[in-house]
Design a protein with these regions (language model features):
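Short, structured surface patches at the beginning of a domain
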Residues: 1-156
Length: 156
């Protein structure tokens, strides 16, 4: 089960986001089980997210996706929601919080991240500090075929 939080987007931020040049941020959090999210977890992670967004003058928070990672290699609803949002141009940057991989397989993570990149979205992983798409790709221990894809992408 995936949860999407809008933080008052429709009520308060729609005009602000529509009338600004700021980059729209979609944050992705994984938790052990979405049925077991505690208010303290939401508060702590939300504060951490808001601190990161505040460091960048040209960023504005659009939405947050919570996803369960108890079945790490299964098709998670949050990932599908993010791809749909990317296809509909609802955000500019994805921040993956406390995760550098969406699967135990580096290739699956790379493929998913590459799809977002091809849709014109920037992807950053945040584990202690912010990591770029290049740093994510280098950390994934890609297969030779995926490494060639990545090298071709860098040259384009």
């Amino acid at each position: 089960m995936e949860n999407t939080m809008k933080f008052g987007y429709e009520k308060h931020n729609a005009d602000t986001i529509a009338n600004t040049d700021k980059k729209r941020i979609c944050a992705y959090f994984t938790v052990l089980d979405t049925h077991k999210i505690k208010p303290v977890d939401i508060r702590f992670r939300t504060n951490e997210l808001l601190e990161e967004v505040a460091k960048h003058d040209d960023w504005i928070l659009e939405s947050v996706i919570w996803d369960a990672n108890h079945k790490i290699d299964t098709n998670r609803e949050g990932l599908n929601t993010i791809l749909d949002k990317a296809k509909n141009d609802e955000f500019d940057i994805l921040l993956m919080y406390h995760c550098m991989q969406v699967s135990r397989s580096g290739s699956k993570t790379f493929d998913w991240t590459l799809q977002l990149h091809q849709l014109g979205k920037s992807v950053y992983g945040i584990v202690d500090e912010i990591h770029s798409f290049d740093e994510l790709a280098e950390a994934l221990h890609l297969t030779v075929a995926r490494q060639k894809q990545y090298e071709a992408l860098k040259k384009a």
